[in-house]
A protein has these predicted regions:
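Hydrophobic membrane-insertion alpha-helices, especially the h-region
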Residues: 7-24
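Short beta-strand segments enriched in small/hydrophobic residues
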Residues: 24-53, 132-133, 162-171
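Extracytoplasmic "Venus flytrap"
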Residues: 38-55, 60, 69-80, 102, ...
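Structural motif
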Residues: 69-91, 194-214, 228-230
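Hydrophobic alpha-helical
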Residues: 97-115, 182, 199-255
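Flexible loop/hinge segments that line or gate small-molecule binding clefts
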Residues: 105-141, 251-259
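Hydrophobic alpha-helical segments within soluble ligand-binding/sensing domains
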Residues: 134-161, 250-254, 269-287
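Hinge/cleft segment of the Venus flytrap/periplasmic-binding protein
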Residues: 273, 277-323
Length: 323
């Protein structure tokens, strides 16, 4: 009798377990994990200067259940071209966008396209009084730090030094601020700035060579990753005395040039954190419907030299996936 009761109890327990499991399945039937699609539009997205940035995006996306689509782009001709890509991504169903604006939104084209769309800007805040959350390293401080690194390398006096500046895309407010910060840092140093060239004036190495032949300089200053790579390529091809190079960047090539002594000092923004924080800011707008208005999240940066390239702090920014 006791044995029969035992088996009956066991059977009832098994039936209850099946019923609970089935009920759970019915309640959750049709429920799907919600993913939001985010389009990321940056200049020349295949460049490895975006490697750490993309890793930060993916880290944030994993935490927020976002699907990140880094749109395949080449170098933008102008803001209108970039805006056409943004418009297409929104038409294709993007729930939000992370954008590196390639110029100022003077005519309101960009603002109009993303009106009502959760939007975060990366690296460049765009118009003079941006309407959007921006995540970037302080551009003025980056420029000033490059200038201070140059002064430190020259013993705090640049008397007798001639300088050529590759200023990058001057349609971007962030690049203009970098130039302003550098100029302020060296204005009383005794340095003679012989030329300042934007990316429109120096599109490739042959163009730089033409300027160099007319006015060679003892120091090259490059204010963004692409210009630093260009200057490094140029210096490698020079015979005889080579100029010192001070720049900004985070790509594999710039790190290689720093390690080989082609670059004297490199300012490196924390692009992993920039990507991560862009997603976190966008999540506030998409998941929690919170709009904190016009805010600016400042990303840290550091100065790397050949001597501190493999220090832990430097590696944490340059190689976040292996640190």
């Amino acid at each position: 009798m006791n044995k029969n009761r035992f088996y009956v109890g066991l059977l009832v327990t098994a039936i209850l377990a099946v019923l609970v499991y089935a009920s759970y399945g019915m309640v959750n039937a049709g429920k799907k994990e919600t993913y939001h699609s985010v389009a990321v539009i940056v200049d020349d997205s295949s460049s490895d200067r975006w490697t750490a940035f993309k890793e930060g995006l993916e880290q944030g996306a994993d935490e927020e259940n976002f699907h990140i689509n880094v749109v395949s782009t080449s170098s933008f001709v102008n803001l209108h071209e970039e805006c056409s890509i943004i418009s297409r991504e929104l038409e294709n169903g993007a729930d939000g966008v992370i954008v590196q604006l390639c110029g100022d939104d003077a005519d309101g084209l960009f603002s109009g396209i993303v009106s009502g769309v959760p939007t975060v800007l990366a690296e460049n805040e765009g118009e003079s009084e941006s309407l959007f959350t921006t995540v970037m390293a302080d551009p003025y401080e980056i420029g000033r730090t490059i200038g201070e690194n140059l002064l430190a390398g020259a013993g705090d006096s640049l008397s007798g030094f001639t300088v050529g500046i590759l200023s990058g895309n001057q349609k971007m407010k962030s690049q203009r601020l970098r130039l302003e910060g550098f100029q302020k840092a060296v204005e009383r140093s005794g340095a003679e700035i012989l030329w300042t060239l934007s990316d429109e004036e120096v599109g490739d190495q042959s163009a730089l060579e033409r300027y160099w032949k007319e006015k060679p300089v003892s120091v090259l200053v490059a204010l963004d990753n692409d210009e630093t790579e260009l200057a490094g390529d140029f210096i490698l091809g020079l015979s005889g005395e080579k100029p010192k190079l001070y720049g900004e960047g985070c790509s594999e090539k710039t790190v290689y040039y720093l390690d080989k002594g082609v670059i004297a000092s490199l300012v490196v923004p924390n692009e992993f954190f920039m990507g991560y924080q862009c997603v976190k800011e966008l999540a506030e707008k998409i998941n929690y419907h919170q709009d904190n208005g016009v805010t600016e999240d400042t990303v840290d940066f550091l100065s790397a030299t050949r001597e501190n390239l493999y220090d832990r702090d430097t590696e944490n920014i340059l190689f976040p996936n292996i640190s």
